[in-house]
């Protein structure tokens, strides 16, 4: 504190793969990993925020089957050396493009231990306008505690699969929706790896002009600015971490290579879900795409982990081997 600080970034691309394929595992020193697309760097909008020792670390707004209801999970971080007694926490919901406040309530939060503290609040707003592909209404939820304030944009909506006489169908806010989608490989002009705001908006607008109501981030984690415009303009998205091939014969080696692989693939998935789980446009996570092996114990464990991080979205996992593909999914 009070001194000059240096933040250093190391960017590596040991494989240098400019092919569209990300399926071949390669050896990098003592590790096996998946190839990238030959690009590297800071791909998002990054900011460094200074806070007091009591601050809001995260807000997860969980949509509910009643689309006018939300469950708000707030992570308050106590970085002092001692537990804190009762603190006041203010929650406010207002229109994203407007001044109308729909909800404002102060809560008393008891006994904040040192470290992370999760608090859950249930909010039901019958007057809230629902988010849909035709009417993408957005709201801001603000949480204040101590001197810190955290604002998260979101939409009221519920996306689900229903069994209609043996036929699985998608529903958005209780109405059937037939998904018309295409894949985006996330190769972008100018720098290859990430879109400018102009290109991000253009992709969403182009998809809607073509009559699509959805796009897939194919074999790659998506970009926040693309999802931001999808939220604003009304386009659904499917997202997957990508590059999850690994020799099935080495799944249970329990050596440095396998430990690195499973730690790496799980970390990618965790970061993807935590970053993107408040976007109303994002409705499906896919854990693996066309992996040539049957699901293993580690795959089911990864799906349970993903579901615990975000129980509000559909999870799929496409694994296959001869003679036919097999899908494991949960919602």
PLM region spans:
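Active-site neighborhood of glycoside hydrolase catalytic domains
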Residues: 261-319
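Aromatic- and acidic-residue-enriched carbohydrate-binding clefts of CAZyme catalytic domains
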Residues: 180-184, 240-259, 265, 269
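Solvent-exposed loop/turn segments at secondary-structure junctions
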Residues: 221-222, 243-245, 289-293
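Secreted/periplasmic carbohydrate-active enzymes, especially glycoside hydrolases
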Residues: 1-218, 224, 229, 233, ...
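Extracytoplasmic/secreted cell-surface and envelope-processing proteins
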Residues: 226, 246-249, 294-296
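Single conserved hydrophobic/aromatic residue that forms the stacking wall/gate
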Residues: 320-331
């Amino acid at each position: 504190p009070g001194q000059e600080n240096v933040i250093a970034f190391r960017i590596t691309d040991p494989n240098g793969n400019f092919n569209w394929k990300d399926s071949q595992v390669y050896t990098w020193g003592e590790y096996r990993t998946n190839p990238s697309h030959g690009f590297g760097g800071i791909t998002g909008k990054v900011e460094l925020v200074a806070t007091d020792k009591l601050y809001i670390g995260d807000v997860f707004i969980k949509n509910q089957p009643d689309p006018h209801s939300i469950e708000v999970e707030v992570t308050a971080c106590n970085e002092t050396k001692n537990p804190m007694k009762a603190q006041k926490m203010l929650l406010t919901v207002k229109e994203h493009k407007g001044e109308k406040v729909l909800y404002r309530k102060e809560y008393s939060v008891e006994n904040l231990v040192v470290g992370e503290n999760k608090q859950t609040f249930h909010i039901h707003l019958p007057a809230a306008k629902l988010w849909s592909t035709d009417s993408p209404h957005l709201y801001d939820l603000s949480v204040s505690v101590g001197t810190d304030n955290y604002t998260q944009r979101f939409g009221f909506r519920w996306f689900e699969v229903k069994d209609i006489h043996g036929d699985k169908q998608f529903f958005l806010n209780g109405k059937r929706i037939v998904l018309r989608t295409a894949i985006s490989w996330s190769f972008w002009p100018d720098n290859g790896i990430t879109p400018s705001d102009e290109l991000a908006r253009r992709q969403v607008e182009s998809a809607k002009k073509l009559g699509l109501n959805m796009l897939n981030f194919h074999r790659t984690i998506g970009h926040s600015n693309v999802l931001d415009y999808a939220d604003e303009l009304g386009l659904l998205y499917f997202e997957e971490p990508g590059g999850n091939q690994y020799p099935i014969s080495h799944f249970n080696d329990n050596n440095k290579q396998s430990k690195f692989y499973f730690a790496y693939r799980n970390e990618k998935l965790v970061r993807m879900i935590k970053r993107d789980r408040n976007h109303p446009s994002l409705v499906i996570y896919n854990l693996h795409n066309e992996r040539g092996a049957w699901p293993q114990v580690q795959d089911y464990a990864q799906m349970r982990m993903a579901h615990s991080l975000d129980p509000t979205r559909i999870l799929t996992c496409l694994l296959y081997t001869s003679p036919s593909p097999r899908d494991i999914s949960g919602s």
